[in-house]
């Protein structure tokens, strides 16, 4: 029997999670998405066009925009009547009061404001700028681009589960789905891709209690694995006019399991930035 040492347990853990490569491939021929489009059908067709055959434990990463568009989350600002509070905040932040009204509707709490930005606790629980509402690459048929904005999906975890289930039925493969968006961070400049909807892969990987390379027991290490993958996929998607909103991932170094976004949201009592 092998000795039950910290070093031997470390070797077992590393071998289990060791990956020769992590491969991210943008899917081709994804059309401009409209309301009520069947994303599962579109993605399966794109996989075929991209000459990718799904395997068990593959992951598909979707840009939030195509999910929101398919779910009808585009809002024409002509239909929005701003409240008194929205009008006041709009003056302070130099924003369109109609957009500010939507931010208030999408948020639990306004945390910070300055000209050009409103920081909120989104109704989904995370902190973000402008409630995740987007003007770019949003248009309605026959209307000015500037009159339309796009809200985040109502329940991104549910959207991810539905997408995962539909694609698994169509392909017979066990996969994960990640829906991502671009967010800033309180302590760094620049936006990065983060997970906002998860199905079939871990949000967090808890390494506490596992040995490190030298056999010492880790005490605090928890990896935001879904956010790490989201950032990698965001590099492939780009932030402007690249038109590659779905990324196929092979070689994710952790076992797939059921999870939800709340794994990644820090409780308020532990949030030192509020």
Residue ranges and their predicted role:
Residues 9, 13-274:
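N-terminal and secondary-structure boundary signal
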């Amino acid at each position: 029997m092998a000795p039950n040492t910290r070093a031997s347990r470390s070797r077992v853990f590393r071998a289990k999670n060791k990956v020769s490569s992590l491969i991210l491939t943008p899917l081709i021929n994804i059309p401009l998405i409209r309301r009520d489009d069947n994303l599962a059908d579109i993605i399966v067709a794109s996989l075929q066009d991209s000459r990718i055959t799904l395997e068990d434990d593959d992951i598909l990463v979707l840009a939030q925009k195509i999910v929101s568009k398919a779910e009808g989350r585009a809002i024409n600002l002509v239909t929005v009547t701003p409240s008194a509070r929205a009008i006041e905040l709009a003056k302070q932040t130099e924003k369109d009061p109609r957009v500010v009204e939507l931010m208030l509707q999408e948020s639990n709490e306004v945390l910070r404001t300055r000209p050009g930005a409103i920081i909120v606790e989104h109704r989904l629980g995370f902190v973000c700028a402008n409630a995740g509402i987007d003007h770019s690459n949003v248009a309605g048929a026959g209307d000015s681009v500037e009159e339309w904005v796009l809200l985040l999906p109502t329940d991104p975890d549910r959207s991810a589960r539905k997408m995962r289930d539909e694609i698994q039925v169509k392909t017979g493969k066990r996969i994960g789905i990640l829906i991502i968006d671009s967010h800033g961070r309180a302590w760094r400049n620049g936006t990065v891709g983060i997970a906002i909807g998860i199905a079939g892969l871990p949000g967090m990987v808890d390494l506490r209690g596992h040995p490190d390379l030298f056999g010492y027991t880790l005490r605090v290490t928890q990896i935001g694995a879904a956010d790490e993958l989201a950032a990698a996929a965001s590099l492939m998607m780009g932030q402007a006019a690249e038109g590659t909103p779905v990324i196929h991932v092979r070689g994710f170094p952790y076992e797939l399991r059921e999870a939800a976004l709340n794994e990644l949201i820090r409780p308020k009592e532990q949030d030192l930035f509020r």
